[in-house]
Each structure stands twice: as C-alpha cells, then as structure tokens.
Amino acid sequence: MPNSHSTQSTPVKNFQNKFLVLTSTPKDFLLLMKPSVMLLAVFTAITGLFIAPNKIHPLLSSIAILCISTGAGAAGAINMWYDADIDSIMKRTRNRPTVTGKIPPSTALTFGIILAFFSVLVMAICVNYISSILLLISISFYIIVYTMWLKRRTAQNIVIGGAAGALPPVIGYSAVTNSIDTTCLMLFLIIFLWTPAHFWTLSLYYTNDYKLANVPILPLVKGINYTKYSILAYTFLTVISASLPYFTDIAGLLYLICSTISGIIFLCYASMLFNDRNNILARKMFKYSIIYLFNIFLYLIIEHCIKHFNIS
C-alpha cells in the first residue's frame, strides 16, 4: 500500500492537520467530492426516478437524490485519499485538495467515511433497503474493487470498475419501485458500455501522465492502435444499447431518432481517432462522450414527460 496512506500521529503532524482543516474552505471539500462525476451520477439517477412506473413522494425522491449525490461524493473523497500519491505525479490531478495540502489525506478519508455511512443509512431509513444496499455496493465497488484493487493492477480496470458508475440510475429506479427489473438494468448497460470508451479517450490524451504514475492504462499495455479499436468497439456497443429503450417500448420514435443522431456523432469521433496522431481529437471525444450520455438520459426524461402529459 502506498506510503501516503499511512497515518502519522506525532504532535506536530496532528497540529498541522488540524490547522489545514481550519483553513480548508467549503469549495475545497466540494472539489474533494468530484462534483463533475457527482453531477452526472445524480442526473442518471434522476432519470431512473423519472422513468420508474410507480410514483414516489417528492420529499422521498429528494432524499434519494441527496443520498445518491452524497454517496458519490463520499466515494470521490476516499478515492482522493487513496490516490494522493499518484495524483501528485499526474498533471491532470496535481491540483486536487489532497495534493495541494488544502485538505489532509486523513481528513479526506474521515470525511468520505462519514458521508458514505450517512448516505446509506438515510437511504435505508427514509427510502427503502434495496436502494440503500445498491448505494452501498456502488460506493464499495468504486473504492475497494476499482480504486484499491484494479486501478494499479490491470488495464481492464475501467471495464470492471465502471460498474460502480453505472449503478446510480438503478438506485434511482429502485428508490421508486423497491425492485430491480430489465428497465433499470438497461440503463445500467448503457453506462457500463459507455464508460470504457469515455475513459480511454482521456487516457490517450494523458498517456504520459499515467506512465509517470505507473498506472497500467490500455494505451500503455496494449498500444495506441489497440486502444482506438477498443474505443470504436465500445462506442458501437454503447450506441446499440442506447437504442434498446425504443425496442422495449420504454421510449418512442422521438427518442430513437435523437439517440441515433447523437450516436452517429459519437461513432464519427471514434472513427476519426485513427487519423488523430497527436490525440487532440481524443480530448474532444472525451468531452463529447459526456454530452452524449447526458443527452441519452435527457431524451428518456423528455419521452417520459411526453407520455405522462399525453403530448402529441
């Protein structure tokens, strides 16, 4: 285990940590929770809430969303605690609060554990046990399976670890239905297949960063071309999976048209990567992949509203 995870109990170190906590700002703690990741998780969870066949009281839905966002933030905080050593090496992550010293790693760990505990507990008490268990699985999977076990050991880390990020819509859906069915599993599948293509485009752009940090990403282990073919394959599978809501009568023709157009653009980006020698386009595809996923889930919400209000 990296040296940064060990705790020092000397009086001087304790005083320094307490002083840093006192000087930490709310913005520092917000950054600790990886707000961009948290927002995407929340939005996909809201989609799960929206398309669920049952109804839930607005207060309970708000509590569920709060628990999901807090749980995602908790996972992000603990991830930053564990990865503080490699984050300090990588250009992309060197400004994280656990690296700059704005928040001591031990404080990040404590903060994350407290958030995780209360998010799961409140979900169990106020919403239902199934959504609470799923939230616990999502947090644990991201921290233990992905961050601590897979990330530094295999280039397939994101393929397996991506399951954690694919759970929020299932949690949102189960918060309403108190069950799991093919509808929410379809949402899970879309995000699960989307995650590798999303992450590998970023890894193409930051290959040197990951090399310095000794993290076995796909471009380093299998090469650039293999990675680009893998991105194309997963992008294709994502686009196909995104059409499933139409063919299972969850969404209508409007959804199919919009998702297909977004999917074609996504595939065009993936195809053009082969002519992207400096990996500049890879970063653009990374940004578009976020827009793509947001749009797919937005289309589902719009379709649900059209059906609910009988808009013709």
Curated annotation (Swiss-Prot):
Top-level EC class as recorded in UniProt: transferase
Cell wall biogenesis/degradation keyword on record: no
Keyword Isomerase on entry: no
Compartment(s) of residence: Cell inner membrane
Membrane topology: Multi-pass membrane protein
Note: Carbon 2 of the heme B porphyrin ring is defined according to the Fischer nomenclature.
Pathway it works in: Porphyrin-containing compound metabolism; heme O biosynthesis; heme O from protoheme: step 1/1
Predominant cellular place of this UniProt entry's protein: membrane
Role: Converts heme B (protoheme IX) to heme O by substitution of the vinyl group on carbon 2 of heme B porphyrin ring with a hydroxyethyl farnesyl side group.
Alphabetical list of PANTHER family matching this protein: 4-HYDROXYBENZOATE SOLANESYLTRANSFERASE, PROTOHEME IX FARNESYLTRANSFERASE, MITOCHONDRIAL
One GO BP annotation of this record: heme O biosynthetic process
Parts of the chain that traverse the membrane: 31-51, 58-78, 107-127, 130-150, 157-177, 184-204, 229-249, 250-270, 286-306
GO CC annotations, alphabetized: plasma membrane
Gene name per UniProt: ctaB
Catalytic activity of the protein: heme b + (2E,6E)-farnesyl diphosphate + H2O = Fe(II)-heme o + diphosphate
Record-linked InterPro entries: Protohaem_IX_farnesylTrfase, UbiA_prenyltransferase, UbiA_prenylTrfase_CS, UbiA_sf
Protein name, per record: Protoheme IX farnesyltransferase
Keywords on record: Cell inner membrane, Cell membrane, Heme biosynthesis, Membrane, Transferase, Transmembrane, Transmembrane helix
One GO MF term: protoheme IX farnesyltransferase activity
Family statement: Belongs to the UbiA prenyltransferase family. Protoheme IX farnesyltransferase subfamily.
Organism of provenance: Orientia tsutsugamushi (strain Ikeda) (Rickettsia tsutsugamushi)
Entry EC number(s): 2.5.1.141
